Amino acid sequence: MRKLATLLVMAMFGFAAGAHAQTPVTGQSSTAPKASTSPKTGTGTAHAAYDRALLRPTMLKDKAPDTYQVKFVTTRGEFTVTVTRAWAPTGADRFYNLVRHHFYDNASVFRVVPGFVAQFGLSAFPPVSAAWQRANIKDDPVTQSNKKGYLTFATAGPNTRTTQIFINLKDNSALDSQGFAPFGKVDDPGMKVVEMFYDQYGDNTPNDYQDLITKQGKAYLDAKWPKLDSIKSATLVGEPAPAAKPAAPKVTAPAAKPQ
């Protein structure tokens, strides 16, 4: 079991450091979004194919437009994100390349803490998660506050952003001083969709929760956390997708063992 680096300024949030997000207690602040750092993988995978270009992160480094939009289709409905590259250029470029190659398609919104954040960005497919585990990008300066509806990368420490994103469900200005740099914003009507994401699991998850998602993919979440919402697709608005490389073969996920 790996240990995840905590992202908190502990005195601010009042939690001890640990391997995974601490369970929030009524009246206390929730832990800041953190990202998995484990390189371990497994054989479970969702029943769909992925763009094999995602297995080579070093090749996906196109510069994003100054502004662009991404349409999300989810199990709760649709919303649109507008990205402003000047807010966080490195993060905006990474997000652009991930969306172009459909990284977020079929991914679950695996962490939703009421009144705090909705977090996603662990691939439905273990081989893809494995490929991006060490594909870190450098931090951007924080030029925008973590306001309600703003999108920001989760991290596991300085210069460790990879693929995980969170949407602020309220104004979380306390995250600004910790280096969380927003790069986009959900349209106002779309926030009604985001606020419907299933949130009753909260942070009541195992210490190795993200590790299990990384190793087993969506198969694990569907078996153990079946009420989670997911992203059916995330696509660039008004821009054709790049020519897809041969898709990975479908693999049947192993039967989940009872807890």
Role assignments for model-derived ranges:
Residues 7-16:
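Bacterial N-terminal signal peptides
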Residues 21-259:
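Cyclophilin-like peptidyl-prolyl cis-trans isomerases
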